[in-house]
Amino acid sequence: MSADVEVEKLPPAAQKVLSAEAPAPVKLMAARGVIPGAKPGDIVIVVSVLAGSDDPKLAETARATLAKLPPPILQGALTADLPGSVILELARVYPNNHEVVTSLLRMSRIGTTALEIMADAADERAGELIATNEELMLKNPTVIEKLYMNKRVRMSTADRLVELAVRHNLELKIPAFAEAAQAIKNELILEPAEEPYFDDVLFKEANQLGERLQLDAENPDTHEVDEEGEEKLKDAVLPLHAKLAQMSVSQKIRAATLGSTGERLILVRDPNRLVATAAVKSPLMRENEAAQISASRAVSDDVLRQIALNREFTRSYQVKINLVMNPRTPLTFSTRLIPHLRDSDLRILSKSKNVSAAIGQAVRQQLSKKNKG
């Protein structure tokens, strides 16, 4: 039983159900929400406690009851002073019931975990309800992180939350927070509104286009090399590129962080360093994307540096050799990777005119070391 449930303050009928001596049939009836004489708040407290029972049947019955509470019971409970553990159970079951979310946010004993669960599962409206409670956001910065990383939360809401964090010197643990924080200083912050703004619709439409985009599963890329050796967008990608081009820097950063493979592979080539870096920092980026990017001469040295610093990516032999061969890779990183290349590739690189003189020399030195050894 949760420590914050004060059984002695519950009515006698509820205390009897929660006592160790209570008969199994009585507990099972209570798990179904049947507790004669108990108020709605007390019923929900008891059912929430039983949902954590060691008895699988009892716990399953209680959880099913919580998920389908009759409106009078649920509404009555939402006016009571519920313990934090009960608020947590309701947050798990009703994260997108906007009436429930509104009531839970007003409760003094709501905890961080309950807020995080609601933020994680929030739809657009629920996200707005949570985010507008600035006092709770400042007390629980991890909830800001959850809302930012939830694609269903409006773009304008995410911007407001980043601005709030920056204004109060909060350091958020989101992948590209440094970039988002720098970008937000130059953005117009929109007030909360009932209807989504143009920026919100744009962000959603871009993500939908990106999700529908069909890219090669093994070698995904939004670009192809033309006859002159220059990268250009594939025709199928042009509508998505047009949407992304309309975005502000902060919008692009979030799209690069949370978006589809197509969005990342376009935005990693963005001329704005903040946007491109956010794309390569995305937790959604996979090894095959890193391999494509590390071979591109259209990305910045900042992007290549981030790939070189990522141990998960540099486990890939293809990423290693791409970074060594790419003239835009900072020399410090490319030379560190040379000892990890195969002898056959070292011999090819030692004679290649497509690598810089410094890399060619470092490769030859590595071969010489191996020959002497």
How would you name each of these model-derived features?
Residues 1-373:
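Alpha-helical scaffold segments
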